[in-house]
């Protein structure tokens, strides 16, 4: 009887555990040497950490509940019908935030405004029961519910902002209240009354109403008594300064019905600095320059003529430039009046010299001066030291500074613009007339022109600035 092989049995019994342990060691060693294993694990750990961090920073919102709420609200909802149709008018509370105004284009009579426009109304179809009080939604939801058909009545062009996404916001409360806001840039019409230009003030309106719903369907109301404005220092008004604003509500009657019209009036006052430098000061200096002609010798024909023509042409250029910043209105503005009067003064200075030169150049020597030397004739002294009447009825002026006369009134020698000796000075038909010496026209002009221009400026500025 052979004895049992204990070692072989023991070897078969213990060989399996030992082999398994060895294989486990080798597998762990190979896995530790594999480079992607640890990195994959670290990435997974990082993703878990980021995911946990997101959940920590963001409040837990039951997204499934919001989706269910929206689906329930939109189920059977008809966005073509206004709230409470056939029951009562829909009340729209409006509000506005003025981000900026400007520039104002006087030629096209329009201005640019950037606003945030808000509308609030109640829609009972959008009520929901949930612990969520308000649904904060983006612009994708706007087209799925009813929105008021508000339009700006005096807008020439309006642009909504789309960068980086449409600048529109929608809020729905659980009681059915809806808030809809958007940002707009509008080129609105403003009828400028330029009678007092450039000392004018304007109230530029921004009007809006419903496009298709009359007062029986939609009623607009201001949410607040006044409109809020941003920092006016960043506004591009340039020639204007912002004075204030006011908002009103009115009803406009049309053939299609009565519409509630909401208006905001922006009060603007023009700044005169630009036009003072560009127009008023140059025109005044040109007028003063034309007076230099009165101190130049009357025999200096080229100098005085060149000065007069130059000032007239300069005034013509200034008047043309001043009109470029204005629309082609048919009435006279304050600047037109000032430029026109300045042109009249400059042109009158040129005409004054033309008149003076004409009469001075047409002087003639006394015809009887040589005759008196050759054939002395007896005379009767009627006016000592002023005039003598000769037998041949020729009248002469004998003054210390005049040896010439002017032909006037039946061939008699004339020494003044309005008066001729002797019939002129002593005649009853000339009684009370002003006696003006043509030779002294420059002296008269030196006083008359500055005085008249100063009086005009006094009346002009007082009338337009204080009356």
UniProtKB/Swiss-Prot annotation:
Catalysis performed (reactions): chloride(in) = chloride(out)
Keyword Disulfide bond: yes
Activity regulation (record text): Allosterically activated by benzodiazepines. Activated by pentobarbital. Inhibited by the antagonist bicuculline. Inhibited by zinc ions. Potentiated by histamine.
Topology feature Extracellular, residues: 40-275, 323-334, 465-467
Region described as Interaction with GABARAP: spans on this chain: 425-442
Gene3D superfamilies: Neurotransmitter-gated ion-channel ligand-binding domain, Neurotransmitter-gated ion-channel transmembrane domain
TM annotation in the entry: 276-296, 303-322, 335-359, 444-464
PROSITE patterns registered for this protein in UniProt: NEUROTR_ION_CHANNEL
Presence of keyword Transport: yes
Glycosylation sites: 52, 129, 247
UniProt topological domain (Cytoplasmic) ranges: 297-302, 360-443
Disulfide bonds: 190-204
Domain of life, source organism: Eukaryota
GO cellular component: chloride channel complex; cytoplasmic vesicle membrane; dendrite; GABA-A receptor complex; plasma membrane; postsynaptic specialization membrane
Keywords tagged on the record: Cell membrane, Cell projection, Chloride, Chloride channel, Cytoplasmic vesicle, Disulfide bond, Glycoprotein, Ion channel, Ion transport, Lipoprotein, Membrane, Palmitate, Postsynaptic cell membrane, Signal, Synapse, Transmembrane, Transmembrane helix, Transport
PTM comment text: Palmitoylated by ZDHHC3/GODZ; required for the accumulation of GABA(A) receptors at the postsynaptic membrane of inhibitory GABAergic synapses. Glycosylated.
GO molecular function terms attached to this record: chloride channel activity; GABA-A receptor activity; GABA-gated chloride ion channel activity
Main subcellular location of this protein, as a coarse class: membrane
Pfam family, one: Neur_chan_memb
Family of this protein: Belongs to the ligand-gated ion channel (TC 1.A.9) family. Gamma-aminobutyric acid receptor (TC 1.A.9.5) subfamily. GABRG2 sub-subfamily.
Job description of the protein: Gamma subunit of the heteropentameric ligand-gated chloride channel gated by gamma-aminobutyric acid (GABA), a major inhibitory neurotransmitter in the brain. GABA-gated chloride channels, also named GABA(A) receptors (GABAAR), consist of five subunits arranged around a central pore and contain GABA active binding site(s) located at the alpha and beta subunit interface(s). When activated by GABA, GABAARs selectively allow the flow of chloride anions across the cell membrane down their electrochemical gradient.
Cross-referenced NCBIfam families: LIC (TIGR00860)
Quaternary structure annotation from Swiss-Prot or TrEMBL: Heteropentamer, formed by a combination of alpha (GABRA1-6), beta (GABRB1-3), gamma (GABRG1-3), delta (GABRD), epsilon (GABRE), rho (GABRR1-3), pi (GABRP) and theta (GABRQ) chains, each subunit exhibiting distinct physiological and pharmacological properties. Interacts with GABARAP. Interacts with KIF21B. Identified in a complex of 720 kDa composed of LHFPL4, NLGN2, GABRA1, GABRB2, GABRG2 and GABRB3. Interacts with LHFPL4. Interacts with SHISA7; interaction leads to the regulation of GABA(A) receptor trafficking, channel deactivation kinetics and pharmacology.
Record's protein name: Gamma-aminobutyric acid receptor subunit gamma-2
Protein source organism: Pongo abelii
């Amino acid at each position: 009887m052979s004895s049992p092989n204990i070692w072989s049995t023991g070897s078969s019994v213990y060989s399996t555990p030992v082999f398994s342990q060895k294989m486990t060691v080798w597998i762990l060693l190979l896995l530790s040497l594999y480079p992607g294993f640890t990195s994959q694990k670290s990435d997974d750990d990082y993703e878990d950490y980021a995911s946990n961090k997101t959940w920590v920073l963001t409040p837990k919102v039951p997204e499934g509940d919001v989706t269910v709420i929206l689906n329930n609200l939109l189920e059977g909802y008809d966005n073509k019908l206004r709230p409470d149709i056939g029951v009562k008018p829909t009340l729209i509370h409006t509000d506005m935030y003025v981000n900026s105004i400007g520039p104002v284009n006087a030629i096209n009579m329009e201005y640019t405004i950037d606003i945030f426009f808000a509308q609030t109304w109640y829609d009972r179809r959008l009520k929901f029961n949930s612990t969520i009080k308000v649904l904060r939604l983006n612009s994708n939801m706007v087209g799925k519910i009813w929105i008021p058909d508000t339009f700006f009545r005096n807008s020439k062009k309006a642009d909504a902002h789309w960068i980086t996404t449409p600048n529109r916001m929608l809020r729905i409360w659980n009681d059915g209240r809806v808030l809809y806001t958007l940002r707009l840039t509008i080129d609105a019409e403003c009828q400028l009354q330029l009678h007092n230009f450039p000392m004018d003030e304007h109230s530029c309106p921004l009007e809006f109403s419903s496009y298709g719903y009359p007062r029986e369907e939609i009623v607009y109301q201001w949410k607040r008594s006044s409109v809020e404005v941003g920092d006016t220092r960043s506004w591009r008004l340039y020639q204007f300064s912002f004075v204030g604003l006011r908002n009103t509500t009115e009803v406009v009657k049309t053939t299609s019905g009565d519409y509630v019209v909401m208006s905001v009036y922006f009060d603007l006052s023009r700044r005169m600095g630009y036009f003072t430098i560009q127009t008023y000061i140059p025109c005044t200096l040109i007028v003063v320059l034309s007076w230099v002609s009165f101190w130049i010798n009357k025999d200096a024909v080229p100098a005085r003529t060149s000065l007069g023509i130059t000032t007239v042409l300069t005034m013509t250029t200034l008047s043309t430039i001043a009109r470029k910043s204005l629309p082609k209105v048919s009435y006279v503005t304050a600047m037109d009046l000032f430029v026109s009067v300045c042109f009249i003064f400059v042109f009158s200075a040129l005409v004054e010299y033309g008149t003076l030169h004409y009469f001075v150049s047409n002087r003639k020597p006394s015809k009887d001066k040589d005759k008196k030397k050759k054939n002395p004739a007896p005379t009767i002294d009627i006016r000592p030291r002023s005039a003598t009447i000769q037998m041949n009825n020729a009248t002469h002026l004998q003054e210390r500074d005049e040896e010439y006369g002017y032909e006037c009134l039946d061939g008699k020698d004339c020494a003044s613009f309005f008066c001729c000796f002797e019939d002129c000075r002593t005649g009853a038909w000339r009684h009370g007339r002003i006696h003006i010496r043509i030779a002294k026209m420059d002296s008269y002009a030196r006083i008359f022109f500055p005085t008249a221009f100063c009086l005009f400026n006094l009346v002009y500025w007082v009338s337009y600035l204080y009356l």
